[in-house]
Each structure stands twice: as structure tokens, then as C-alpha cells.
Amino acid sequence: MAVNVRDYIAENYGLFINGEFVKGSSDETIEVTNPATGETLSHITRAKDKDVDHAVKVAQEAFESWSLTSKSERAQMLRDIGDKLMAQKDKIAMIETLNNGKPIRETTAIDIPFAARHFHYFASVIETEEGTVNDIDKDTMSIVRHEPIGVVGAVVAWNFPMLLAAWKIAPAIAAGNTIVIQPSSSTPLSLLEVAKIFQEVLPNGVVNILTGKGSESGNAIFNHDGVDKLSFTGSTDVGYQVAEAAAKHLVPATLELGGKSANIILDDANLDLAVEGIQLGILFNQGEVCSAGSRLLVHEKIYDQLVPRLQEAFSNIKVGDPQDEATQMGSQTGKDQLDKIQSYIDAAKESDAQILAGGHRLTENGLDKGFFFEPTLIAVPDNHHKLAQEEIFGPVLTVIKVKDDQEAIDIANDSEYGLAGGVFSQNITRALNIAKAVRTGRIWINTYNQVPEGAPFGGYKKSGIGRETYKGALSNYQQVKNIYIDTSNALKGLY
């Protein structure tokens, strides 16, 4: 299937600052390609420090009036954004598929609808938020107000470009902040097109979108004196740099980082449900998911039943053209990611690991122009193996046999990460006990990789700081002000 790219994507994009697309301070551009075909999709502006200065100044000026708008006004605008996203769902989903390589069935059903739902959700959250009043005694009253912080500086990863942007933009502007956000230089196109919706709905300067290299303009955003709050989704290595910038400037930061999550299959699991959940955990979005269930811990009593079923299921996955609605797995997002995956396959071959399924790049039937990789299942002897400890970020699943629930818990916790995990069991008490014992921010029971609004998402340990996607996330973008009132008119007599 082929589409006319220009029906969806412009040949060039400027920076979106103060409600319009503008030229950058430099003529430098970055080529944006389709990872499934190698074709050039567009060229984006390579922002420089001067452009960051401009965007932050505009956001500061817009904050003065935006922060004073009523909650109901902001809520209505967020709803309008969500409605317009859904009205253009098919177009934006195709842009996401063209630019990211993920299947159209995923972008149509998940990426864009869930982005829209986050705008609707935070419209309701801000509209129903209430302050508090505490009568400390008969003459004193304490009022608690939640006020916006100011200018938010955000950078999002390349694996869910539009959805991750919505996770940050929706609560930030709902709370009354303005934002300067930068998508990945490899997958910026969906957010740039959605800028046209912001242009229709929001006052100028509330949302500003820069494009460029993370090490250049992204770093400049995080280290700008005019930015009052940082928000980042990406690797743990870069997360450290963002945390350092936040500490240096004494501003708060929300960090959603890497993971190496354990998916635990107990001996009483519904195996049909487990096989589907395992695939959801590691094959969804080609395994390019921070919460991927990339360590499979299988009870020894069912290991010999489950593994052959997984081998068959993995071999039947349709990997191919992301625009084909029958495709279940598309292209990895780029050559660097493909090479990284291959390096782990090579490490497996040189060790005592056993490749049970997959393990190869796919190049037949026209796939040689993209970065397609087979669903891969690898048995490792224990959790200390390189493949069980390091985040691969691809459709590569390591499987480890466990003897009981406690060993599963111990192995699940034997990781520097703590983002997510799963438990499959028909005994809810048993599953809950494991869920409580595993030190991660999210545990799915009898499903995996569900990311709805209204449920907090974020990690323990080196997987991040803070939570997103639920009403408590609004507080990430607010400051608390206390107004303390003395109504007694009485002197205290101390001076």
C-alpha cells in the first residue's frame, strides 16, 4: 500500500513559536525519513540556542495572560483539542505510521485516540479540582491554592511521539502553564501537524514546538534560566543529565525513563491469556516501549507447555508494511536501533543463551529498505545474563524458568529499573501479593501494556521520578500557595 506523502506531510517545517511556523536562526535542517522504506518525508528546522531563547521568551509573555484564564475556559480548549484530534485521527495516525514505522492498526486505535483522551481527561481534572480551607481555630483560617508554575520545558522520545507529547502538554496547559516542547528529531512530524490544531484553539505562545537535536536545542531547553519546570521521557542516561539541569537551576523535574520489566507467568495462569499478554508485552510497538515485558519469568511446572506455544505464536506474527492493516509489527525506528538489537543477538550467540525463535533481520519482500526484525525469544540461564539486565528496546524476549512465587519476585526485583511488570494467574490473591512485592511503578495483572488516562504511570529506581497520565499528575505542573488569615484583629503582644 502506498499513499501520497504530500497529502499528509509538508515538504518543510519551521519552528512553531507564538502561534505560527517561523524560520529558525540558522538555515540548517534535518532530514526526516520513513524507517520502513528509507524515503525522505520532510525537512525540519534545526533549532539553535537563539531559537530556544525566543521560544522561552514568548512562553513567558503568554504565561502572564494564560495563567489568569478560568479553569472552565482552559477545560473547553482542551476538549476542543481532543475533539479535533479525533476528527483528524486517520490523517494523524498515518503521519505517525509513516514517520515512526509502527503499524497503522496501532496508531489508529491507540496512539491518536489515547492522545485525544488525555486532553479530554485533563479538561475534566482541572474543571473539578478544588482548593481547601482549614479553620485552624476560631480566629485563623488557612487557604490552599494550586497555582501554575510558569514555563514548562519538555522533550519527548521517538517511540510514541504524539501520545507522549499529549501526556505532557495536556496537564501542563490545563494547570495554566505555557510550554516549550521538543519532539525527537527522527519522529517530529505528527506533533508539527497537530500544531495546526493548537493554532486554531489556543492563544498564541501557550504551546511552542522546537525541532532539533536533543544534545543541542533539547539541552538548551533544560538549561534555560527562563524555564520553571522540566519534563522528559527517554533514556535513563539522558535522564541523569536532565536531573542535573533541574538541580543546577533548582526547578522540579518529571522523568519517565528506561525499564527492564518482568512478566511473571504462574502455574495457574490461563495460558491463552498469557500467550496474548506476553506478545502485548514485547511485540507491541516493535518492542520499542519503556515498559516492555522483556523478561519472561515462567513457573517451571508450565515452562514446557508455554514455550512451544510462544515459539509458534512468534513465528506467526505478520511483520511488514506498516500501512497494511493486517500488519502486526512494523519497522524499528532506525538503523541505530536495529544495530543495537543485532548486537544483543550476537551477544546471545556468544554466550550460553539459546535462541528459541527469531533472531534475524527481515529483508525479503521489499523489507530490505527498512529496519524490520523478527520477534525473538531467547532462553537465558539466569537473571545475571546481559540480555536479562540491559534494556534492548526491541522485540527480543528473554525467558527464565522459576520454581516458585518468591523466586519470581526476587528475580523481578533484581534490576536497576522499576518501571512496570506483569503477573498472569487465576488466583487474584496470589497475583496481588506478587504485585505488591515487586518494586515497580506499574504492575498489570492478566494483561499488559495498557496505558489509559486515569491510571498513574511512572517508575521506581532508575526508571524515573514522578507519575503521569492521572489526576495527580496535575500537581507536577502546579505550585501550592498557602494564604493564612488572622481574623481576630488582636495584637499578639510579642513586641
UniProtKB/Swiss-Prot annotation:
GO MF annotations, alphabetized: aldehyde dehydrogenase (NAD+) activity
Q: What is its EC number?
A: 1.2.1.3
Known catalysed reaction(s)? an aldehyde + NAD(+) + H2O = a carboxylate + NADH + 2 H(+)
Q: Where does NAD(+) bind?
A: 212-218
Q: Where is the active site?
A: 256, 290
What keywords tag this UniProt record?
NAD, Oxidoreductase
InterPro entries per the UniProt record, alphabetical: Ald_DH/histidinol_DH, Ald_DH_C, Ald_DH_CS_CYS, Ald_DH_CS_GLU, Ald_DH_N, Aldehyde_DH_dom
Pfam families, per the entry: Aldedh
For this chain, the family text in UniProt reads:
Belongs to the aldehyde dehydrogenase family.
Q: What is this protein called?
A: Putative aldehyde dehydrogenase AldA
What species is given as this protein's source? Staphylococcus aureus (strain MRSA252)
